[in-house]
Amino acid sequence: AGLTTTELASVREGLFDAASQSSERDKNELEKFDGFLRDHPWRFTAVVDGPNVAYLNQNYDGGRFRPLQIKAVVDVLEARGHRVLVTLPAKYCEAVVPNHSKFATPLPSQEAEQALDEEEIALLEAWRMRGMLYAVPRACHDDLYWILGTTYNCLAVSNDRARDHWTGVFDSEAQYRRWSRAAVASVAISPDGVELSSPPVHEHASFASISSEGASIAVAPEEDAGEWLRVDVVFKQNE
């Protein structure tokens, strides 16, 4: 099961606190995004971690930031009836963007860069016009934005499980695990298309058997504790 409304509100406050540790500006910008989610005429149901998806499978010589990979994921989500929001750092919403793929060759005294082609620029502009692209201000931590989206019951699409954030945002590791299982879908992109998958609710299957004494024994994992719970049910025989 996912987090309760009260727990989601607590996570939201944890995100604001995390942003404020960087600067008051970061907190103010995240609060603006919170207002955007709350007041937008659409009720978004999915949020895509843009950079994570765009760089998927790009750690090779010639790899680059690929907005069309984001589009492929957006198309799948919209086909399933989702109202989709894409979060991207502002530096990726311009005609020339950084290239942070693993094998990008930095230019002298600056980051490697790439120029988006006309199709990619038009794609970003189309999302902007539809109100489904949010440019995260420079120097702000973009992970906090898509995580915040999940507190409004959005399904997040990212292969980044935000493990670096749970200690400052979630009350416990168990709460973080429940959030991750319920709110974050991983993504794979191949020539065959896009595959979205969420981890199962339980990491282990339940087990049940009937003992020789006529008792039903059910064993199931306790989600928060990572332990196993055994229940013995004894059926009274008719005399």
Show the residue positions of the predicted features.
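Noncatalytic, typically N-terminal accessory segments of nucleic acid-processing enzymes
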Residues: 1-239
